Amino acid sequence: MCGIAGIMDLSLERVPLLARSLGVMNSLQQHRGPDGEGAWAHPSGGVGFGHRRLSIIDLATGQQPMRDQAGNWVTYNGEIYNYLELREELGLEFFTTRSDTEVILQAYRKWGHDSVNHFRGMFAFALWDEARQTLFCARDRFGIKPFYYTVVDGVLYLASEIKALLPFVPEVETDLEAFKEYLTFQLCLAGKTLFKEIRELLPGHVLIVRNGDIEVRRYWEVYYTLDFNHTNKYFEEMIRSLLEESVAFHLRSDVPVGAYV
């Protein structure tokens, strides 16, 4: 569990006290990442990232926010379980670390916004594309990792937890409609939260900021294919095989792994 934070002026104007604000956001999410803290601010002062790290893979060189050769930056929470396979596919010569964080940067280099379709894992990240002056954010298919954001006076704030956004909201108000939904369904619908000005990036969605506009769109949805051509025994064996494969992927780590029973 790591903590991500980001600030971007939609017009890429200089954000007052950018570095200090990122520090505040990191401090409010310190419990999410006891192993390290990092921050990056663009020279223009119009965009910056923060990060609190819980070290799992590549303890020595996986610090964030992370930069690639093209000047792109990423802040990321989660784990890309198929990162070893993606490293091979993308070309090991492009990598300078063993971190799955760098896989996100190199996948974006090759596939752009379609990179999320290649990831097998749980993730929430924000990536700054220097050449296109674009912010690209994504959340995993099932929303295992959290991602919240708000826009105040033309400035976008994003974080792993709502508490890191509250200092920047001038007037914190309860969204009564979302509150009714929560009491009914135990969740808020359509990306709403219990706070009027704060939104949740839905599972399987990306958020893109370019030319001052924010676009949110779905990149994945669950679908079912009916199959009447195989026996129950076939499906039992297939499910077992898929579960064993999934567990093997989930156990990849550079530190000891535990599980609740």
Segments predicted by a language model, with ranges:
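Cysteine-centered catalytic environments shared across enzyme families
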Residues: M1-V261
